[in-house]
Amino acid sequence: MIPPAFEYLRPNTIPEAIAFLQQYGDDAKILSGGQSLIPMMKFRLARPGYLIDINRISGLSYIKEEAEYLKIGGLTREAELENSLLIHSKYPIIFDTARVIADPQVRNMATLAGNLAHGDPANDHPATMLALGAQVVAVGPQGERVLPIESFFVTLFTTVLQHDEIVREVAFLRRHHEAEGLT
């Protein structure tokens, strides 16, 4: 199937992406990996008039421990999580989740942030992020908001993200020992 017609926008900065979101409102959707959005468009379940491709924005793909947090950038691919030595050694629950998502082709495109922002209850990461007590860091015209994962999901395919916000990163408390688990 071919999706309905849409206008493709490719900002180079977060402020530019936010400006597009403000300009086009609810008729715009963010495209990061597109692994859930594009199929929904093909089935006419989503019909955005504007796709805002944020893949050209630099500085949104990272996995790093900083202070007391592990931070995963908004454009970090599932494959990066699966192949990260840090994730594999200290955060095996994330590794185990990432490695079973679809197939390698999907994991090379799909993002953790997109997985969460899409709000699909069938996705793999929401349960993992709930278990880890994650925080979603969103940025919009009013600045940055830190959203606890426990209150992030509203209902099917709906989150507390405003129409003019982008997920900049997902963060949660660091694990200080290899093989530390959750009980």
Where are these regions (language model features)?
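C-terminal structural segment of proteins
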Residues: 1-183
